[in-house]
C-alpha cells in the first residue's frame, strides 16, 4: 500500500499506512516495556495481542517503518524502530558458543504463555504499578490506560491508545525511567518459552531490515549485527556447499526451501547495495545459480518451494501468494530484477520475464495477495538506478550516499563505485564518473540518466522528483 502511494500519490493509501502503524505502535500489540511487536491483535483497537513474538513480523515492520520514516520523519516510528531493534539485539541473539566474538544470528520466537497462562509475563495490575513507581505512578497510569479493573481479563495490557503522540523530551524521559523500572521487575518473572531455532529465511528478513535501518539512521551497530547474522548463516548453515533451513545447538536440519535462498539472497544484495562490498554480490550470484539449478521450473517458469533433490515431498508446490512472510517467488522476482540491473546479465531478466508471464493475472482479487511479486514487476520495469562514483572514504562520497539512504525512493537500486570500477556495458550510466575530480551521483530511469549531482542538497531534491 505504501508503494502504491509512492507510485501514484494516492493519499488514501498513505493515510491507511500511517494510521495502521500509529495504532499498532500505540496499542497493546506493541511491547511498551521491552520493545517489539506481538504476532497479531485479537481486537479492532490493536489492544489485546496474541502475545507470541515472531522474528519475521518484527523484521518486516522494521523495514516498512524505516521506509515510511524516510518520508515522514515521524518521531514515533523512529522510536519504535530503535526500541524494536534494541529488543532483538537484547533478547533474540543466538550464538554458537560462549565466545563473544563469534558471529550471531537471531532466534525464531517467544511463546505467548508462561506458567500456563497466555500473556502472564506481560500484564500488570494497578496495585503493582503503584507499589513500584510510587509518586510517578499517577502520571504513568494516565499514559498507559491503567485503572483498578484492568482492560483485559482483570489485568492491564500497557498501551498508549489514548495518548499515541509522543510528549516533550522531558515527559518521555520520565516515562522511560518508569518503563525501565517495570522492565527490571518483569525480567525476574518466569519467561515465556524461547524458540531458539535459527531459520535461514527469517534471518534473511532481519538482515535486510537491519542493513536498511542501520544505514538510514547511521547506526553502525545495527549494520554490524546484520553482517554477523549473514556470516552465521553463510558459515554455520551451509553443508557441502548448500544452504540448510534450520540450525539449533550446532545441528543442521532440512534442506533449504525456496524462501531460504530467496531471503538470504535479498539480504546479500541489500548488504552489497548499502556497503559496496562486492563479496556480498558474489554470494548473491552464487546463491541464485544454486536456486536456478535446484528450484527453477524449466517447463513453465517460476520456482518450486522444494529442491529437485528433495525426497520427502509428495509433490513440488509452486506459489506466488504472500502469507505472513513474502512468497519465495515474489522475493525472487525482486532478486532477479536487482541482479539484472547490477550485473547486466540478461538471464536474470529473461527469468523475471518468464515469471511475469506465468504469474500475471487480470483478476484483481488474486493480485491483492501477490504484492511482493507486484513490487518486483515494478522494479523490473521502472527501477530508479542510483550510481554514486567516488572513493569510499571520501567525505563527499559519504555525504552523497547518506542522502540516498535517508531519502524515500522505494524502487531504488544503488550502485557504489570507486572511480576505476566499470559498469555493465548496457547500464545507462556506463562511462560516467567523477566530475572535476569530485564524487558524483547519477539517477537513471530506463535508458536515461540525470545530470551528475555533486551537492547532497541538489541530489535530495532530484531524488524527491523520481
Which sequence ranges carry the predicted segments?
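Glycan-recognition and catalytic cores of secretory/periplasmic carbohydrate-active enzymes
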Residues: 1-466
